[in-house]
Amino acid sequence: MFYTVDEIATMLQVSKSKAYKIVASLNKELKKMGYITIAGRVPKKYFQEKFYA
C-alpha cells in the first residue's frame, strides 16, 4: 500500500537523504490535493504514476 524511504532509495538507486526529499515532495503534492499523508511513506500507486507512467 505504501513505499518507505528505504524502498524508494533502493528502487531509484539514490541516497536515503535524496529519497526523503522525494517523499516529502510527493507528500506535499498530495496534501495540496487534500489527502492526508504519512511522513516517510508514499502511496505505491501515486509513486508509480509519478515515476513509471
Per-region residue spans from a language model:
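A generic alpha-helix surface/boundary motif
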Residues: 2-3, 41
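Absolute protein N-terminus
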Residues: 1-2, 53
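Residues within the helices of the helix-turn-helix
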Residues: 5-6, 45
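Short Gly/charged-rich anion-binding patches and loops
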Residues: 3-4, 25
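Amphipathic, hydrophobic secondary-structure cores in small proteins
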Residues: 1, 9-10
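Major-groove DNA-recognition helix of helix-turn-helix-type DNA-binding domains
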Residues: 11-48, 52
